[in-house]
Amino acid sequence: MAHKKGASSSRNGRDSNAQRLGVKRFGGQSVSAGEILVRQRGTHFHPGVNVGRGGDDTLFALSAGAVEFGTKRGRKTVNIVPAAAEV
């Protein structure tokens, strides 16, 4: 095994692909059930009303409505406010 670099070799040249994390739907936007709201590692945002959490901590809408960001007990939460039912 060579312990020195050979001619024109390098120890660099590797990088991982971006994970495309972050908020996907912002406050006030209307969403339908099942839409992804936040992609995250860990629970930076916690699920609130009408919001579910996936196995990779992704937050998604459980019902249609408008996105609302807020806090509860010092934690950032994401809620879905249902649209007014039409009569």
UniProtKB/Swiss-Prot annotation:
Domain of life: Bacteria
GO MF annotation, one: structural constituent of ribosome
GO biological process: translation
Cellular component annotations (GO), alphabetically ordered: cytosolic large ribosomal subunit
Pfam family of the protein (one): Ribosomal_L27
Transmembrane segments: none
Biased composition (Polar residues): 7-19
InterPro entries: Ribosomal_bL27, Ribosomal_bL27_CS
Region of interest: Disordered: 1-25
Keywords linked to the UniProt accession: Ribonucleoprotein, Ribosomal protein
PANTHER family per the UniProt record, alphabetical: LARGE RIBOSOMAL SUBUNIT PROTEIN BL27M (PTHR15893:SF0), RIBOSOMAL PROTEIN L27 (PTHR15893)
Family membership: Belongs to the bacterial ribosomal protein bL27 family.
Protein name stated in the entry: Large ribosomal subunit protein bL27
Name of the gene: rpmA
